């Protein structure tokens, strides 16, 4: 397909039943995994439809990786019971303590 101009390429793709569309205005794409997130900023996103199946091609402008702290409901309930606080307060204390139960409880019961 060397030397094929864009118009010929579009015509060939249409004959093969392939549709392509560039998504405009995409600010970021977030990939969530256990324990971390990858944020793709200002990506070029193309959607290709072949035989009814969609495929997304993402080319990021920049990338950021963030660690994600996962706090279980059981941990939140334990802090609530031990420190005598509500759900939101217990969750916030655990987040600030990076999931450390003892540190969260001590912080809430001291002072």
UniProtKB/Swiss-Prot annotation:
SMART domains attached to this UniProt entry: NAC
Xref: InterPro entries: NAC-like_UBA (IPR044034), NAC_A/B_dom_sf (IPR038187), NAC_arc (IPR005231), Nas_poly-pep-assoc_cplx_dom (IPR002715), UBA-like_sf (IPR009060)
Keywords on record: Protein transport, RNA-binding, Transport
UniProt keyword annotation of Transport present: yes
A Pfam family it matches: NAC
Single biological process term from Gene Ontology: protein transport
UniProt keyword annotation of Protease present: no
Gene3D superfamilies: DNA helicase RuvA subunit, C-terminal domain, Nascent polypeptide-associated complex domain
GO molecular function, one term: RNA binding
Transmembrane segments: none
Domain NAC-A/B: 3-72
Function field: Contacts the emerging nascent chain on the ribosome.
Family: Belongs to the NAC-alpha family.
Subunit (UniProt): Homodimer. Interacts with the ribosome. Binds ribosomal RNA.
Protein name: Nascent polypeptide-associated complex protein
